[in-house]
């Protein structure tokens, strides 16, 4: 087992540890050795766009676009989603994400962007008005504001920093319910249900 504390939020064994106020995260997390799901590639897919998103540049107010589509080698039994990322100076990067190897309890933002768009394509009825990715980002932004996690929607860490996205949804579920914000509460339930299929 590979034990590290490098930019990992979430513990696959114990989702989160709280004090009586439910606002203290455990001081370190255990990261299981993962099958690599991401690969930076040169081949460009010409498939239909599944969804779009944006990443922030921490050095400026500029946001850069990203798009998800199926990779050319993707199949029904072995889905692979290609993520296109636009970067400063008109640079473009492409990442292939093997959906069968993504673990939402220990995943980067890039992996989750690919997974959410795949889920919405396969189960359109569960995507909500704006899609799973937008729902998850809203929850994540609230979790960051509450001090439960840190921002991984940045150019410098979206492909490297892993978080426990199921743990984040479960944590925010309590906050939303307590505040009477039932739409986001329901989003947390739906996302946890969908993500559990990939753990």
Positions of the model-derived regions?
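Type III/flagellar secretion export determinants
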Residues: 1-199
């Amino acid at each position: 087992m590979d034990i590290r504390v490098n930019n990992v939020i979430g513990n696959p064994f114990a989702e989160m540890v709280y004090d009586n106020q439910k606002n203290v995260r455990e001081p370190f997390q255990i990261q299981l050795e993962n099958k690599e799901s991401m690969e930076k590639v040169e081949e460009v897919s010409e498939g239909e766009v599944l969804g779009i998103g944006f990443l922030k540049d921490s050095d400026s107010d500029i946001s850069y676009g990203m798009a998800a589509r199926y990779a050319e080698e993707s199949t029904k039994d072995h889905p692979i989603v290609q993520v296109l990322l636009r970067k400063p100076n008109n640079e473009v990067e492409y990442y292939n994400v093997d959906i069968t190897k993504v673990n939402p309890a220990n995943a980067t933002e890039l992996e989750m962007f690919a997974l959410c768009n795949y889920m919405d394509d396969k189960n359109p009825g569960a995507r909500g008005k704006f899609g799973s990715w937008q729902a998850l980002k809203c929850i994540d932004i609230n979790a960051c504001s509450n001090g439960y996690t840190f921002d991984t929607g940045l150019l410098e860490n979206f492909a490297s920093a892993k978080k426990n996205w199921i743990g984040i949804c479960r944590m925010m579920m309590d906050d939303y319910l307590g505040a009477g914000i039932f739409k986001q509460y329901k989003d947390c339930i739906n996302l946890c249900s969908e993500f559990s299929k990939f753990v």
